[in-house]
Structures are given as C-alpha cells and as structure tokens.
Amino acid sequence: MERVLIVNADDFGLSKGQNYGIVEAYRNGVVTSTTALVNGEAIGHAAQLSRELPALGVGMHFVLTLGKPVSEMPGLTRDGLLGKWIWQMAEEDTLPLDEIAHELACQYQRFIDVFGREPTHLDSHHHVHMFPQIFPIVARFAAQRGIALRIDRQTVLNADDLPSDLRSTQGFSSEFYGEEITEACFLRILDASAHRGEASLEVMCHPAFVDNIIRQSAYCYPRLTELEVLTSASLKAAIAERGYRPGSFLDI
C-alpha cells in the first residue's frame, strides 16, 4: 500500500535562520511542507522564499503564545504580548474564546495578504489548537474553508466530535524532537504508523540554521541536528524503501 508522508517544518517566518533551514531541508532533504507564523519577525522573508518554491506546501502556524497578536486581545495578552500563561488560563477555563476566534480569522487573512494565497492547512505554535476549549473553534474554521488541519488524535477524546468534512492525516507524530533526533527515531515513527495501517502520516520538525533569534529559543541547537538528519541521503532512501510517497496537505 502506498502511503503519503508529510514532513512539516514548523516556525516558517520565525527568523531568517529558521527560514533558510526549512528551505535547505526542502531542497536537499525530506521536508515537503511548512507552516508559517504570520506575526514572526521574518514572515516577509518567508513569503519571498516561498514564491521561489511553488511546490512547497505552506500552511498557517496559528500563534497564541509568542509575540504580538494581529488583533487586539486584551483578555489574553500582557503588555500587548502573547505568552505561555495561556496554559494556566486553559486550566482555569478563563480563555477569551471570542478573542481567540477573531484572532484566528485575522491571522488567516494576514496569511493571505502576505503569501497571496490560502494556506494548505492549519496547525499551531505549541499545539494550542489542541486545547479542548480551542480545538472546536479551529476545527470548525478549517472545515468551513475546506483546508486541512493537524490533529493529534491521541488528545482528541471523541473522534465523533470532529466535523465530517474536516481533512487531516490519519497519523501525526511530534516525536522527532528533543533529545533523540536521529534517523533511527524518524524511521521508528514511520514503522509504527505503517503497523497501525495509516495511509497518511505527518511528522513534525523544526530544522533551522542558528541566528540571534533562534539563540533566544529554549529549543535552539537541536534544530541544527534536525536539519542534519533531515538532509541525510540515507534517510531519503529509507523512506522510499518503506513505500512512502512524499506529499503535502493538498494530497489529503
């Protein structure tokens, strides 16, 4: 059985080093797709690079934890900035859901304005779209617009709650991250997906070259390691041997 493999590089637009790393992993590696933060410092640079790579699938990386929002969000920001306090607000069930829904629409429009096209799919920075309070908003938004959505099915308690016309891969993995970034880890992800009988799989990654912005990230130098593994000729060959076809969310 032919299986579709989407290797999606998150954080397009975060910095020029991030952008160049993603492009390198696409041109000379196994990355097939990316998602962009429309409030990132290098989003214009990302859009410029993407015009030179029309086959690279570019989706939107919904942001509620970093930088300035596109719209006014007094209920979520502190001193005008987004941050990781969103986790505490989610636990306390005090999220400003109307503001979040409006910000999603505004970021979506900003994406269209910057890239000149709709995103191939949606996901989010730090997986905030998988919060139980936020997921229905984002799932409904994606379904209404006919675009795909990253879904971590391990966190969706009731698959029956998903909109019937929502598109996503059958499998998703965030395991290629952290301390064990190796070719063996990547291939274990593929083999586990194949064992589950999934016809499509998304693997999340964050390849980058280090610059001053990336140095400020708690997840800095592992991005270089990811880039090294993702551009390995042996990894590309091993993926092909397993019957996976590289694709984007337009293939789902």
From Swiss-Prot:
Its cofactor is Mg(2+). It holds the Pfam family YdjC. GO terms for cellular component: cytoplasm. Its main location: cytoplasm. GO terms for molecular function: chitin disaccharide deacetylase activity; deacetylase activity; metal ion binding. Mg(2+) binds at H61, H125. Gene3D superfamilies: Glycoside hydrolase/deacetylase (3.20.20.370). InterPro entries: COD_ChbG_bac (IPR022948), Glyco_hydro/deAcase_b/a-brl (IPR011330), YdjC-like (IPR006879). GO terms for biological process: chitin catabolic process; diacetylchitobiose catabolic process; polysaccharide catabolic process. It is found in: Cytoplasm. Pathway: Glycan degradation; chitin degradation. It catalyses: N,N'-diacetylchitobiose + H2O = N-acetyl-beta-D-glucosaminyl-(1->4)-D-glucosamine + acetate; diacetylchitobiose-6'-phosphate + H2O = N'-monoacetylchitobiose-6'-phosphate + acetate. It is an enzyme of class 3 (hydrolase). Belongs to the YdjC deacetylase family. ChbG subfamily. Homodimer. Involved in the degradation of chitin. ChbG is essential for growth on the acetylated chitooligosaccharides chitobiose and chitotriose but is dispensable for growth on cellobiose and chitosan dimer, the deacetylated form of chitobiose. Deacetylation of chitobiose-6-P and chitotriose-6-P is necessary for both the activation of the chb promoter by the regulatory protein ChbR and the hydrolysis of phosphorylated beta-glucosides by the phospho-beta-glucosidase ChbF. This is Chitooligosaccharide deacetylase. It comes from Salmonella schwarzengrund (strain CVM19633).
